[in-house]
């Protein structure tokens, strides 16, 4: 049997008395395009944050390729994600932000210019991200998610 790329088993997250995710289980097979849909407040972002190790589940597990995200040696080489377009330091240029991401995940620096070109930010790559519009910030976030030749 092929190991799922993503798996959640009985994943639950509560905040105080509020249950944001309630015993969620699913698998995503390699090579499949999978949507994750639901109304506001359904727990989509919370689930993604648990998969990415940003929030600890109250119970259950979420794995990437059979491993907890926190156990991945170079996670950005396996997983690309964009949860918030505004987490870039406002005084860092788009290029330097991506260089930092590449360096900390053992990704060749040449990939930085490739993804800047993919998302149409080459002409503003040396500008401070704090001056970017929402759309430009979202494209920079997407560039970060695409930085590696990702599996997920």
Residue ranges and their predicted role:
Residues 52:
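Helix-to-loop junction immediately C-terminal to a conserved catalytic motif
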Residues 56, 60-75:
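Conserved ABC transporter NBD signature motif
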Residues 150-152:
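Conserved small/polar residues in nucleotide/adenosyl-binding loops
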Residues 99, 103, 109-124:
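Conserved ABC ATPase "signature" region
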Residues 39-43:
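Walker A (P-loop) phosphate-binding loop of ABC-type ATPase nucleotide-binding domains
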């Amino acid at each position: 049997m092929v190991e799922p790329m993503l798996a959640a088993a009985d994943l639950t997250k509560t905040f105080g008395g509020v249950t944001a995710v309630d015993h969620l289980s699913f698998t995503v097979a390699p090579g499949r395009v999978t949507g994750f849909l639901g109304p506001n407040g359904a727990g989509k972002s919370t689930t993604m944050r648990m998969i990415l190790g940003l929030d600890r589940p109250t119970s259950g597990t979420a794995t990437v390729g059979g491993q907890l995200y926190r156990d991945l040696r170079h996670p950005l080489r396996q997983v690309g994600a964009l949860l918030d377009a505004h987490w870039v330091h406002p005084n860092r240029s788009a290029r330097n932000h991506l260089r930092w991401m590449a360096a900390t995940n053992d990704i060749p620096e040449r990939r930085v210019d490739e993804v800047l070109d993919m998302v149409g930010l080459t002409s503003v790559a040396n500008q401070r991200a704090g001056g970017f519009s929402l759309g430009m910030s979202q494209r920079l976030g997407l560039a970060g998610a695409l930085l590696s030749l990702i599996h997920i």
